[in-house]
Every structure is written in C-alpha cells, then in structure tokens.
Amino acid sequence: MDSFYIITNILKDKDYAVTDKICNYIEQKGKKWTLAKKDEEGHILPGTVPSDVECGLVLGGDGTLIRAIRDLEGEELPLLGINLGTLGYLAEVELKDYQYAIDRLCGEEHAAIELRMMQRSSNT
C-alpha cells in the first residue's frame, strides 16, 4: 500500500503527537498520507477521501473505529484500528506495534495483514 488516510481521535491525541509520529514513519517508508477532514462535531466530511488512498488508519479506540465506519459508509476503504486507549477489541493494533503493522501494510514483511472491512447494518 502506498497511500494512507489518517483518522485521529483528537480527544486521545490532543496535540497530534502520536499522529505526527505515525505520519513521519509513513513518510520514511516513502509512502503518502492524508489527514481526514472533519466537521465541528468530529465527523469525517463526505467526499473528502482522496481516490488514491488504499487504507484508513484509525487512531483512537473502538468508538473511534465505529464512528469512522459510519462516517465512511459507501467508501470501499479497509480500516486498521490503532488503539490509543487502554482496551480495544476492534482496534486490533496496539500503539507500541504501529511500525510493525505499517511495515506489513507496505509489503515489507511479505505477509498479508487482515484489514477490517465492516459495514453498517441497515438496522443501526
């Protein structure tokens, strides 16, 4: 993968220190990233995902991942949750392992990483 869409929970990364660290690592790999554009309530603005993006990295917790899934309904974008909280069931990568996960996504480990493709149920 060559291009990432970064979705940050600013309540868990107020000064964007973690986001900056992850974006810098992506750049070191020679890859591109785009920070999600959000409205005043923190929802991702519709139609703002660049067409060349291949994967969304969701920095937060399970709630952040669920919100991203809802906000990106209709987009064919796999998401990988990077947990910035204490416990995450859906956000499967712990912060300490973000470099390994990005390496795998970039193909350097020559192994596939399972990306979560969740769809919002019509009942929710």
Question: What are these model-derived regions, one by one?
Answer:
Residues 19, 25, 77, 99-104:
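Residue-level signature of transmembrane alpha-helix interfaces in integral membrane proteins
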Residues 9-12, 86-92:
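Flexible, glycine/proline-enriched loop segments at strand-loop-helix junctions
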Residues 1-60, 64-74:
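N-terminal glycine-/serine-/threonine-rich phosphate-binding loop
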Residues 58-60, 81, 121:
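Short beta-strand segments
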